C-alpha cells in the first residue's frame, strides 16, 4: 500500500500535516509584492492601471484561501473534491489496464521502490527507473480520460453552469469584461486552447487588453487532464494533493487578470463589458461524439507531453555530458 512505501515525512505533508514557517509566509508576501511591482513597471501605460482589478483580484485569492483553509465548510468541499478526483483516477486505471494490461501499475506510487523493469538501467536509482514506465502507462492515459470527461460535461451543459458562476463573481468584483472573465474562468477547468474558444465570436471586437488577458489566463492555469496527471504523480506523497491543485487553479484565475491588467491596462470600450451571460454552445452532436472528440484532443496533448519530456530530458542529459 501507499503507506508502506512512502516515507513518513512525506505522508505527513497533507493539508493538516504541513506547517508553514513564518519566514516562508513573509517570503510569499514579498514575492507577491515584487511580482506585482514588476508587472506595473513593465506596464504599457501605468497611468491607466485599474486598481480595482488589482485589489479585488488579490482579495478574491485571500478570501478563497481563508474559506478553504479556515472554515469547516471549505475544508469539507476541499476534501470532497480530492475524493472525487482520486476516484476518477481509479476509473482511468481501468481503461488503461484494458489497453496496456500488466504494464499499468495500480496502487503503486510513481517514483518509489526498486527498478520496474529488467532493462539495462539497474545502475540508475530505482526511483528513476520506475518513473518512466509509470508515467507512460498511468499518467498520460489520465490526460486522455479527463479530456474526454470535460468535453462530455461541456456537451451536457454542466461545466457552462460552473464557469458562468465563477465568471459572474469575478466580473462583479473585478469589473472586467464578460469575454475575458469567462475565458479566465474556463481556464480553471480546460486548457488554454479550449478556453478561448468559449469567446471566439468576440475575438474580432476584443481590445488588446482583453486579448492579453485571455492569453495570460491560459498560461496561469493547467488543463483538467494535466491537473489530473499531476495528481496521479503526487498522490502517494501528498494524499490531499487534488484539493490543493484545484484550489491553486481557482486562485490563479483572478491572479491572471491582475497581472494582465497591470501589464496591459484597458484603454478601450469592451463590447462585453458587464456581460457574463454569453452562450457557450457545444459543437458535438451527442455524448458519444463529445467523448470521442475529447479523447482525440487528449491523445494529442498526451503525445505532446510525452514527446516534450523525452526530447528535453535527452537534451539536458546531452548538455550535462558536454559540460562534464
Where on the chain are the PLM-derived regions?
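Interfacial loop/helix-cap signal at membrane boundaries in integral membrane proteins
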Residues: 17-21, 69-142
Amino acid at each position: 500500500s501507499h503507506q508502506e512505501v512512502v516515507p513518513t515525512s512525506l505522508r505527513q505533508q497533507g493539508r493538516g500535516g504541513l506547517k508553514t514557517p513564518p519566514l516562508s509566509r513573509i517570503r510569499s508576501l514579498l514575492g507577491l509584492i515584487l511580482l506585482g511591482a514588476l508587472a506595473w513597471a513593465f506596464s504599457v501605460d501605468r497611468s491607466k492601471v485599474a486598481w480595482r482589478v488589482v485589489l479585488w483580484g488579490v482579495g478574491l485569492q485571500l478570501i478563497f484561501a481563508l474559506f478553504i483553509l479556515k472554515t469547516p465548510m471549505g475544508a469539507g468541499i476541499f476534501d470532497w473534491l480530492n475524493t472525487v478526483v482520486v476516484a476518477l483516477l481509479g476509473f482511468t486505471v481501468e481503461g488503461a489496464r484494458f489497453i496496456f494490461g500488466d504494464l499499468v501499475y495500480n496502487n503503486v506510487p510513481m517514483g518509489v521502490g526498486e527498478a520496474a523493469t529488467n532493462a539495462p538501467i539497474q545502475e540508475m536509482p530505482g526511483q528513476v527507473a520506475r518513473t518512466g514506465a509509470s508515467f507512460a502507462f498511468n499518467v498520460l492515459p489520465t490526460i486522455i480520460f479527463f479530456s474526454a470527461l470535460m468535453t462530455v460535461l461541456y456537451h451536457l451543459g454542466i461545466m457552462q453552469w460552473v464557469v458562468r458562476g465563477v465568471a459572474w463573481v469575478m466580473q462583479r468584483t473585478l469589473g472586467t469584461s464578460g469575454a475575458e472573465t469567462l475565458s479566465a474562468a474556463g481556464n480553471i477547468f480546460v486548457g488554454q486552447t479550449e478556453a478561448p474558444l468559449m469567446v471566439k465570436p468576440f475575438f474580432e471586437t476584443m481590445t488588446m487588453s482583453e486579448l492579453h488577458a485571455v492569453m495570460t489566463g491560459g498560461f496561469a492555469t493547467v488543463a483538467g487532464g494535466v491537473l489530473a496527471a499531476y495528481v496521479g504523480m503526487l498522490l502517494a506523497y501528498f494524499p490531499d494533493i487534488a484539493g490543493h491543485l484545484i484550489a491553486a487553479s481557482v486562485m490563479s484565475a483572478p491572479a491572471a487578470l491582475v497581472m494582465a491588467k497591470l501589464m496591459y491596462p484597458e484603454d478601450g470600450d469592451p463590447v462585453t463589458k458587464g456581460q457574463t451571460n454569453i452562450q457557450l454552445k457545444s459543437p458535438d452532436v451527442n455524448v458519444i461524439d463529445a467523448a470521442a472528440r475529447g479523447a482525440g484532443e487528449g491523445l494529442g496533448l498526451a503525445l505532446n507531453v510525452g514527446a516534450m519530456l523525452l526530447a528535453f530530458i535527452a537534451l539536458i542529459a546531452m548538455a550535462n555530458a558536454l559540460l562534464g
